[in-house]
């Protein structure tokens, strides 16, 4: 079972710093390459590279609200879930049902280019998770026992990557990313739950509510973008492959993204991904 994504909110703040003096032509080129659309949509990481001596710091905020339970592609009501067997033993059937979940993520990032061909990128991820659940009696009428919430917050992960410029001419930019992420937050957080018997117990939260899995993940990506005046089109393929884990891990992932952006002014752009 999993939750369907219902609402997203993205905010980003970044500062670009050039460490080298520039003449007039360099300054014009610098301004052209640092319009708002040169930064991809907030959900993309490592979407651009920098010139030698440039650096950037950024703060990204993302909020996700999720509701509804699914088994595969089939939406389940609470009564459907109460009929499913309990994989942990007693009671015989599932009796605690998630209702909705909020996730708040803050990403603190930094980039620095020691050369025109390599950009260093670091990221610290902080997360806060909150889930509302409902407990039902374990037998007979399966009446509602009550509602409760569980929460977790703190450091999630730290990552370091290298971005390698492959192409940068006539509005076309192509680069590769290779990095390593350490899921260094806590993976055994506990909280109080309302049991089907009506008691309050402190238990280890399920993996979806944990902040980290104590694993190391190899990050790799290939990103291409093309700029036409005030328009920009881009695509990115990305993989996250676990290379070392503790007792469990979140699993590997593979992503493909396509986006289009348009400048509104020097500091603002809209995007569709």
Residue spans for each PLM region:
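Sec-dependent signal peptide recognition
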Residues: 2-10
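N-terminal signal peptide c-region/cleavage motif recognized by signal peptidases
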Residues: 14-16
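Transmembrane beta-barrel domains of Gram-negative outer membranes and organellar outer membranes
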Residues: 20-173, 179-182, 202-212, 216-220, ...
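Outer-membrane beta-barrel translocator domains and adjoining extracellular loop/strand segments
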Residues: 69-76, 132-140, 187-195, 236-237, ...
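Aromatic-anchored, glycine/proline-accented short structural segments
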Residues: 213-272
